[in-house]
Amino acid sequence: ALIEDPKEAVAFVKQPHIIEKRKELRENEYGEERYVLLDERSGSLESVKNQILKLIKKYDCKLIVIDPVNDLFESCSLEQQTGFIKFLKTVIKDGVSIFNVCHLTKGKTQTDRDGNRIVRRLTEDDFSGVSNLVKSGGCNIAATRDKLAEDETEQNSTDIEVLKCRWSGNTGYAGSWYYDNLTHTLYDKEDFMEKQRSNF
């Protein structure tokens, strides 16, 4: 179910049974962390496949995050990249979720008639690498930030947009995050700004 009201969303995640589910997601029945970090940037796609299978079989991993997947594809042929994506699809069929963090192609800076920089919205065509990765995704989410903005608030804001979501069909703007440099904390931007206004 889609919860659009932020207060309702917070109330939902604070329910005792949801807190218990979050703990269950984070820890196994012995209180051990469920997360395993694998740093395999220099390995071949074949060695990464083997490591992923090890994570699934040895550690019973149900969620694999590849960040960034673009690094794995450097110096690989299109055929090798496509083969790796097919491998990921077989893993998904076994009940494992895959999150591929994908860098974007750097587009040219565009300006309007007055010379002001135009920040354009991203599309699935902006994802760097093999197009099968984007086409195969169950949900494609873009996170963008205007690092060159003159306003510090805008410079530290990241906008989230759902470009595709197979299970719900809901797409579009999904919210913004604000990174506060003073506290080194990431906030929901709307909540942070509301809190700032109420402090004055």
Regions of interest found by a model, annotated:
Residues A1:
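Phosphate-binding active sites in nucleotide-utilizing proteins
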Residues E4-V36, L45-I66, L78-E79, T90-D94, ...:
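C-terminal regions of RecA-like/P-loop NTPase motor modules
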Residues I66-D67, C102:
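Active-site flanking residues adjacent to catalytic metal/cofactor-binding acidic residues
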Residues D71-E74:
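Residues immediately C-terminal
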Residues F87:
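Short, conserved SAM-binding segment of the class I
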Residues V96, N100-H103:
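Conserved H-loop
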